[in-house]
């Protein structure tokens, strides 16, 4: 094998490694799930507080949760999605609501 071929193979390996390192992180949807007990106003409050939505968008998502059973609140990297789920769950428990927040890979 010539020296040029060896160098080209090494460069290709390095490029493959760089491409793997530069791949975007997996993304996760954060979802709110409907229940029969959590008030609609509380769901809107959660959406505004934890997902930085304006009240109109929060109202639309709340209605989607109510009528379709669940809705996407946002899409984040794994760590941020986990944090959002934890924050919403703790906040709901603190206010004695059974609101469920989950995450799914996109």
Swiss-Prot record:
It comes from the Bacteria. GO terms for biological process: protein catabolic process; proteolysis. Pfam families: ClpS. Disulfide bonds: none annotated. SUPFAM superfamilies: ClpS-like. Binds to the N-terminal domain of the chaperone ClpA. NCBIfam families: PRK00033.1-3, PRK00033.1-5. Involved in the modulation of the specificity of the ClpAP-mediated ATP-dependent protein degradation. This is ATP-dependent Clp protease adapter protein ClpS. It comes from Pseudoalteromonas atlantica (strain T6c / ATCC BAA-1087).
